[in-house]
């Protein structure tokens, strides 16, 4: 996916939450990543801390955007864990399951 500005097709939508599913191509460092000044790791993935948060306060990342190309099961597990940290960040605590950590590596 590549997002490009097109003056004739611009739309603005109010939203409480925006989720991007990036698939296998990784983050496009020329668009939203650049606009929000999101830091990337040495592999070109969105850098995140141990709580799934990027360098932008309140912006969390899970799945391929943070891990790099991987299996859907990793994206699902990371999404669940990330949701628990988002819940905790918003509510001050969470009872949601958190099956994996941001730096957990698959066995090879």
Show the residue positions of the predicted features.
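Mid-to-C-terminal Rossmann-like scaffold of FAD/NAD(P)H-dependent oxidoreductases
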Residues: 8, 91-108
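Short, surface-exposed, polar/charged, turn-prone segments marking secondary-structure boundaries
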Residues: 45-49, 87-90, 101-104
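FAD-site-proximal beta/loop scaffold in flavoenzymes
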Residues: 4-69
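Solvent-exposed, non-transmembrane amphipathic alpha-helical segments
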Residues: 35-39, 52, 82, 99-106
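A conserved FAD-binding loop/helix module that cradles the flavin
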Residues: 65-90
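Non-catalytic alpha-helical coupling and interface elements of nucleotide-dependent molecular machines
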Residues: 20-23, 27, 81-91, 95
